[in-house]
UniProtKB/Swiss-Prot annotation:
Biased composition (Low complexity): 13-22
Residues binding a 1,2-diacyl-sn-glycero-3-phospho-(1D-myo-inositol-3-phosphate): 174, 176, 200, 215
Single annotated GO MF: phosphatidylinositol-3-phosphate binding
InterPro entries: PX_dom, PX_dom_sf, SNX8/Mvp1, SNX8/Mvp1_PX, Snx8_BAR_dom
Name of the protein: Sorting nexin MVP1
Organism (species): Kluyveromyces lactis (strain ATCC 8585 / CBS 2359 / DSM 70799 / NBRC 1267 / NRRL Y-1140 / WM37)
Length: 512
């Protein structure tokens, strides 16, 4: 049993109805005992939470605290705005206007109607506060001869375009199917905010109900974030994942599906190039510089909110325990005060009311915990998921968005000089001349292709950063819901105490 989740062992099978003191003592000797956090221990818990709960995320290496870093400037060093004049290499391309483009250091885009219209059109495609439309439930029966695995019942709650789902809109999927879906999305959309998966982990943890519950919630957040994304939700393989009723692993072996990235055969539009400003890249660098700090902060917030709810759950258990103990008072008072039957009867009646009150207070706390666990925690964690998705996008940009345009440009210049020399030499062979000319042509085409891809990547990241701005309202939503829940159940609790206070006024304080 996880003693951190249940340090009083209230859910232990050994408890039953046994209310002996030894069972209910907190396990203070254990390192998992629930105790107050220091700044360092909270940091360690936050580090562990991120590295345990997400695949491929290791931002807190060696458990070090997050400190303010320096901007990587990977976006500011992009050759497309540091070297805008590529000479004649743009004359044979569909990318019109590249040789005229010049980045500006003034925030002209703020007053640019074209940019505003573009941003508005992108924002309207993303609704992070929308209700989840996919449910993921664990199927109790596990499959597998040697290594048992868990299956999940995945159900989409709304119709999906261009699909022919089963009547109940459900499919059975296992963890490896989710892993496959994330893999193909990263292949096709490397510069989109593809969410992270919870860890798989095998062995004893695969039978741990707490781990399995956490993983199921993580899978649910993953697929719902995918379905809220304006591009990912329309992908054919996402729709296949949600609607093909057969075993997906068998389908993958037989089917032919495309995983080439989204930029294949796509050309950048001149309208986007005209609205681009260098300030965008500076904003990305600042966001990239601070994203680990933001992630660290939100993990700590979530840890502390969940920690508070755990404490309140223990309070609820102890109030029920106190009620059970108080039930023994009437028998003892009748034996202790045999000559005061009238007043003892009133006292016993009051004790019975206190027992009812304690159970009512415990029920209020349990309902609050259930609402926080099912509705509030998932929203705090979904915001963490979004931050991690943006961080992953930035990391993939650093690894995958490079180009060798400067080297190719230099080679074109050298070969052009060589070609001019060959043209002025009548003794040179035609084969050598043709070889140099073809090399120049290939390099120019490669420059154009890489420029086009770099511009498409830039457009893609700006789209993602624009829709990411809509997630700011998740912050408001999380805290408004948290405060509303606390206020509502605090009022319920106050009402209970006011009622018991009025009822106990008739308990005797002295003989009449």
């Amino acid at each position: 049993m996880d003693l951190e989740a249940d340090p009083w062992r209230v859910n232990s099978e050994e408890n039953g109805n046994n209310i002996s003191g030894s069972v209910w003592e907190p396990d203070n000797s254990s390192v998992n005992a629930l105790k107050s956090y220091s700044a360092d221990s909270l940091q360690q818990e936050a580090n562990k939470r991120v590295n345990d709960d997400y695949l491929g995320v290791n931002i807190f290496s060696n458990g070090d605290n997050i400190v303010r870093g320096t901007a990587s400037n990977v976006y500011q060093n992009d050759v497309l705005w540091d070297r805008p004049n590529i000479g004649s290499t743009t004359q044979e391309t569909d990318i019109r206007g590249v040789n005229r483009f010049q980045a500006t250091d003034t925030p002209q885009y703020a007053a640019n109607d074209e940019y505003k219209n573009w941003v508005e059109s992108v924002r309207k495609t993303y609704f992070p506060l929308a209700e989840d439309i996919v449910s993921v439930e664990e199927i109790p029966e596990r499959e597998g001869l040697v290594f048992k695995h868990t299956n999940y019942l995945v159900k989409h709650l709304t119709p999906l375009p261009n699909t022919d789902p089963s009547d109940d809109r459900t499919v059975v999927r296992r963890y490896s199917d989710f892993d496959w879906l994330q893999d193909v999305l990263l292949r096709k959309y490397p510069f989109r905010m593809v969410p992270e998966l919870p860890p798989k982990k095998i062995g004893s943890q695969n039978a741990d109900p707490l781990f399995l519950a956490k993983r199921r919630k993580g899978l649910s957040r993953f697929i719902n974030l995918v379905m809220k994304h304006p591009v990912l939700r329309s992908d054919d393989l996402v729709l296949t994942f949600l609607t093909v009723p057969t075993d997906l692993s068998g389908w993958r072996k037989q089917a032919h599906y495309d995983t080439t990235d989204e930029f294949t055969d796509k050309h950048i539009s001149s309208s986007f190039m005209n609205l681009w400003r260098k300030e965008f890249s500076e904003q990305w660098n600042k966001a990239d510089e601070r994203i680990d700090i933001a992630l660290d902060t939100w993990v700590k917030v979530t840890v502390l909110i969940e920690r508070y709810e755990k404490r309140m759950k223990q309070v609820a258990h102890e109030r029920k325990l106190l009620g059970q103990i108080l039930n023994a008072i009437p028998d003892t008072t009748e034996a202790l005060y045999p000559q005061s039957t009238a007043t003892v009867s009133q006292i016993n009646e009051g004790v019975g009311l206190i027992v009812e009150h304690l159970n009512s207070c415990a029920d209020v706390i349990e309902r609050e915990n259930e609402e926080v666990d099912s509705g509030l925690s998932v929203r705090f964690k979904a915001f963490i998921d979004v931050i991690i998705a943006l961080k992953g996008l930035f990391e993939r940009y650093k690894m995958m968005a490079g180009n060798n345009i400067p080297q190719l440009q230099r080679r074109v210049e050298i070969n052009q000089e060589r070609l001019n020399t060959l043209e002025s030499n009548p003794d040179v062979k035609g084969a050598e001349y043709d070889r140099v000319k073809q090399s120049i042509s290939r390099d120019k085409r490669s420059i154009l292709d890489q420029m086009n891809r770099s511009w498409l990547i830039r457009e893609c990241i700006l789209e993602e950063f624009t829709i990411f701005h809509e997630t700011q309202f998740l912050i408001t939503d999380c805290f408004q819901r948290w405060i509303e829940i606390n206020l509502r159940y605090t009022n319920n609790n106050v009402d209970n105490w006011e009622k018991i206070c009025k009822k106990l006024r008739d308990m005797p304080l002295q003989r009449h």
